[in-house]
Amino acid sequence: MRADMHLGAGDPGALERLLAAETGARERALVEAWRRHGWRWARTDPLGLAPRDRDPALDADDAPWLGPLREALERIYAGPIGWETGHVHDPEKRAWLAAAAETGAGPAPGERERAAWLLAATERFEAATLTRLPTAKTFSLDGAEGFMVLADAVIRRAAAAEAVVGGMHRGRIAQMALLFGKPMRRLTAELKGAPDLPQSLGAASDVPYHLGWRGTREDGLAVRVLPHPSHLSIVAPVAAGIARGTPGALPLMLHTDAAIAGQGVNFELMQLSGLAPYSVGGTIHLVLDNRVGFTTDAAAARTSRGPADVARAVEAPILHVNGEDPDACLRAAAVAVDWRARFGSDVVLVLTAYRRRGHNEIDEPRFTQPVMQTAIDARPRLGAAYAARHALSPDLAAFEAEMDAAFKAAPATPNDGGDAPGLAPDAAARMLAAPETGLAEDRLRALLARLGAEPEGLALHPKAAKFLARRRAMAAGEAPADWAAAEALAFASLLAEGSPVRFSGQDSVRGAFSQRHLVLSDQGDGRRVSVLDGFGARAEVFDTPLIENAVLGFEYGLSVADPRRLVVWETQFGDFLNVFQPVFDQFVTGGEDRWLMTSNLTLMLPHGWDGGGPDHSTGHLERVLARCAKANLRVVNASTPANWFHLLRGQVHGPLRKPMVAFTPKALLRHPGCLSPLSEMGAG
């Protein structure tokens, strides 16, 4: 395919000159029709099986004098990239996307050589694993090698401090070897059955295609590939949280068509993407669309036209790319990275390709997709075709020698495991040993007085003013501290010591029971002031959307990335565990044992028989306890404000980083018998 087939009209200024000559309404209408609907007529399916839909608007005006303009637009918008951007309403963004589609240059020097090498190396690696390990599940990328070019180009162009990758099964092993820098010998050892962690650690570990990796590529770019469970998309919010806690990170999410369309956590994460507390500067989503999920055809897998239609809700542009056009992959990657740099928001690239081997190496795809598989069998190898087209000869000698040595090596424990004190035999005893969390009483009084001070010039609600007055009375020794005061003291004291605090939850800033008031509102102009500002380290205090699964995953990921920070998330009621159970099971309670991921996340589940019905009143203590094993979790039910103060501070000052689930009270928040003198929060 000629380079000019997807670079404007072969001339970056061609369309501008055509429009400059004819600027009437009919010309503009034709251009707008192609910009909005042309992607449905683009040649993005290499098999030619997906139906193409030519919108009537593209041919509504058949005036002969519009012919040159129509031809130019068809070359731009009906080529190997489908520009699905009509749902983007911001005028500046629309103009930017139109310019990106209608102008541009060919691949930069060296890009085609790199692409040709990647295609050839991927084909060799996939062939070697099939020949040498015929029963190993690698979820081959055979038939979708263009995805390697796409992902590699994104990482290279972004050149971020670290690419944080939430991945997928498809092509996982090849990506580790060729994109992410995992040592080949270690990969093959894991495929042969060697544990990825020393047995002396006592860790459960996982199958090879679930494992993560953190290292440096040959070009010096750092990558962090998150481990994931078979519930694939649940890793995406975890990766996003880690990206937020990693300065200069690039969040890169890899999806397959069935997963991004079918798993609701993807929509949840996109709903978070434009909210300031969850901002990561834009996530680049790469979707591998094989038009089949395991054995399920696309027609049975989703109602939407495309797999990534969830992105339309947040007006993220969606570029559809022909998986057999590496030059189109390079261009789409450049557009995605530049979009993120310009607008700091999400963008989606959908690469349409196919699976030569079915779902995995022991699958028989002809049982369910015989027509598709016949078309696949007729396709030539992309690597050889691309190299021949551009007269390139990739040198694979060093790669093949390394690969051959790795496959011949005897399986051995490939990892020294590093430091894992949370899995040591004495972990439970260390968790039960109370750290020093108390503070001098005069220090507590000073902090509490600041927490009770009325912000200058703020017209308070009368009940909020009384709330602060009670705080000042506690600071003066006229009354013991209630639950909310002890909690605020824990936060303020950590901030003063230099530990950042991130407290969030569903209606939690005020408190679902009006007990907290961490942010005060001016009754006249609505101005808001956080009572935790100015104590030292950064305090984040905010309400979260009515989203449990993605929010918990994000908060967990952030706690993994930043061990200095106290991360606390509160559900509105404890039974909301029902909705976040997947990320709780897979990561919060199982992340350390499987993947050595440590976290001090604190999860608050309001719990108690207070007239809410049998389910709405419970945090399901039995389910949480069922997930406890090998000292993986703190489960607490504090009975006094002082208990709660020490528990929160212990999450920062304790000897081991462990998640804590707190079954927090409702009736006790204002119970006259549930008060603590400041002396109970003292040292010793």
Outline where the language-model segments fall:
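Extended, charge-enriched "interface" segments that sit outside catalytic cores
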Residues: 2-148
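Conserved phosphate/anionic-ligand binding catalytic regions in large, soluble enzymes, centered on
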Residues: 31-46, 149, 153-179, 236, ...
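Conserved pre-catalytic core of RNA-dependent polymerases
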Residues: 88-148, 152-207, 509, 516, ...
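Active-site cores of enzymes that catalyze phosphoryl transfer or operate on phosphate-rich substrates
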Residues: 104-126, 188-240, 244, 638, ...
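Glycine-rich ThDP/TPP pyrophosphate-binding loop and its adjacent helix/strand module
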Residues: 150, 226-412, 575, 610-612, ...
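Cofactor-binding active-site loop characterized by glycine-rich and histidine/acidic residues
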Residues: 161-164, 168-315, 319, 513-562
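Hard-cation-handling environments
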Residues: 393-501
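ASCE RecA-like P-loop NTPase motor cores
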Residues: 495, 509, 527-684
